[in-house]
Amino acid sequence: MNILFVINDAPYGTEKAYNALRMAMMLQKEQTDIVEVRIFLLADAVTCALPNQSTPQGYYNIERMLRAIINKGGQVKACGTCSEARGIKGLALLEGVEISSMSQLAQWTVEADKTLVF
């Protein structure tokens, strides 16, 4: 089963990115043989892909969560237009995260058995 997570919020300030990644990690842990996880970072969520961020007190480390998902075979892409609008398109991203496009998001959506939007 192919599950697509579309995340829209910044890594810190709300718990949307955290909850999306927590769900993705749980699916990878408990449904290893039947689930393929894909994550598309959209809008302010593209900043989730920046390495070495300071984790605010009381929050979980989003970088660590993304790395765990990637290390278990999850695919993570960040919207190029959103990255450019936020001035991060030329910056180094977490290893395994690729700048992508709405065309890719459309393709992933068509291929997904389920799409979850946070």
Language model region names:
Residues L4-A20, A49-S54:
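Short, glycine-rich nucleotide/cofactor-binding loops
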Residues D9-A10, A43-V46, C82-A85:
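Acidic, glycine-rich active-site loops and adjacent beta-strand->loop/helix elements
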Residues A17-E30, I39:
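Histidine-anchored nucleotide/phosphate-binding helix
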Residues A24, E36-A43, V76-G80:
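Short internal beta-strands
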Residues I34, I39, C48-P51:
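Primarily the HKD phosphodiesterase
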Residues N52-Q57, L93-E95:
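Short glycine-enriched, charge-decorated loop/helix-capping segments at active-site entrances
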Residues T55-T81:
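A glycine-rich helix N-cap at a beta->alpha junction
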Residues A85-F118:
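C-terminal structural segments of small proteins and small subunits
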